[in-house]
């Protein structure tokens, strides 16, 4: 089977009149982080990155030795995580780090030393763990780091509105002034009409897939939809003279704790439960490339007492609702997905520090 693209960033709008049991509730004033690509959500702006799935996999495979099931009933999102639809094999080894063990200060130092040596990075979440809690059992951790340039350095275009906004935002791309030849830095996946198209910005090992759509489906369904449409498309997949491209600069920094997974006694364990289920993302996209840093951690606790439950020239303009995926070129699945509807939530502030 052909492996997934190396880095995909997807921006999706997932609004629906009817929501399934695995729908994740969210506020409407921020970007929502999702634990799995297949999660449904009421939040228009949302993002998924594969780091939390990696943490879940390590816990299930190396500590639980099987699926993670809760004594008081396993929620749909946990069932989806148990399917392990994203794995380390879908990433290049130099782009991620994972660790697990007893929750000790020695493990914390081991992780800090490892991510500094491998990525020259520090952690934003390890200090959120209470390393001296007497109920500590295990800590599982992962980091994903991507920093790449496109094969084409795109021009900075004039500011304009996004999705009928009042504010004007920065864009990069290719316009009629600088498109006098074919451009192999942009691969056309399909162009069905002025409201339904997708392209892939090329890097050496990764690509950025941009899909113009108003779809409310989950990221997994949308990614499958892209592949189906690309396979059926009979038009030119070369970005040719006369084609134009417009993409917004984006900065996103978010952190979440998946509380729906916390506080439930885990079956077939000695009274273990998830204390915290943390996930972060720092994402930056400009005219030269992508910077992405994401962490995830699960603190596993041991219950001491009962705890509370808790056709002519085509215009590839991404100035309206769109979805972005990041993936490695030789992999079959994306490791990042994002749906963008409200640009106020993604105001470009410069490179992620």
Region spans (language model):
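Positively charged n-region of N-terminal signal peptides that target proteins for export
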Residues: 1-4
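Hydrophobic core
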Residues: 9, 13-17
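Hydrophobic-core positions in well-structured secondary-structure elements of globular domains
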Residues: 22-353
């Amino acid at each position: 089977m052909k492996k997934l693209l190396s880095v995909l960033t997807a921006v999706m709008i997932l609004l629906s009149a009817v929501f399934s049991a695995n729908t994740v509730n969210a506020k409407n004033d921020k970007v929502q982080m999702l634990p799995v690509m297949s999660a449904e959500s009421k939040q228009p702006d949302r993002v998924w990155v594969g780091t939390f799935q990696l943490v879940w996999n390590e816990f299930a495979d190396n500590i639980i030795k099987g699926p993670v099931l809760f004594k008081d009933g396993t929620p749909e999102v946990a069932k989806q995580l148990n399917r392990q639809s994203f794995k380390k094999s879908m990433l290049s080894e130099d782009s991620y780090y994972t660790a697990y063990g007893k929750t000790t200060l020695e493990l914390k130092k081991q992780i800090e030393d490892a991510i500094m040596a491998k990525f020259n990075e520090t952690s934003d979440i390890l200090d959120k763990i209470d390393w001296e809690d007497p109920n500590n059992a295990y800590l599982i951790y992962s980091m994903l780091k991507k920093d790449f340039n496109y094969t084409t350095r795109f021009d900075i275009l004039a500011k304009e509105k996004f999705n009928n906004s009042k504010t004007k935002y920065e864009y990069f791309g290719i316009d009629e002034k600088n498109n006098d030849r074919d451009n192999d830095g942009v691969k056309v996946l399909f162009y069905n009409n002025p409201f339904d198209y997708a392209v892939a910005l090329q890097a050496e090992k990764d690509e950025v897939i941009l899909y113009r759509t108003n779809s409310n489906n989950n990221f997994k369904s949308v990614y499958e939809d892209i592949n189906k449409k690309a396979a059926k498309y009979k038009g030119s997949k070369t970005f040719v003279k006369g084609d134009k491209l417009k993409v917004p600069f984006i900065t996103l920094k978010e952190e979440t704790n998946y509380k729906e997974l916390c506080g439930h006694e885990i079956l077939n364990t000695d009274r273990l439960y998830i204390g915290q289920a943390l996930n972060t993302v720092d994402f930056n996209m400009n005219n030269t490339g992508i910077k992405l840093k994401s962490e995830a951690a699960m603190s596993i606790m041991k219950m001491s007492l009962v705890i509370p439950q808790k056709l002519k020239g085509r215009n590839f303009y991404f100035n309206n609702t769109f979805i972005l995926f990041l993936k490695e070129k030789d992999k079959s699945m994306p490791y990042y997905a994002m749906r963008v509807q409200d640009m106020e939530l993604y105001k470009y502030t410069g490179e992620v520090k």
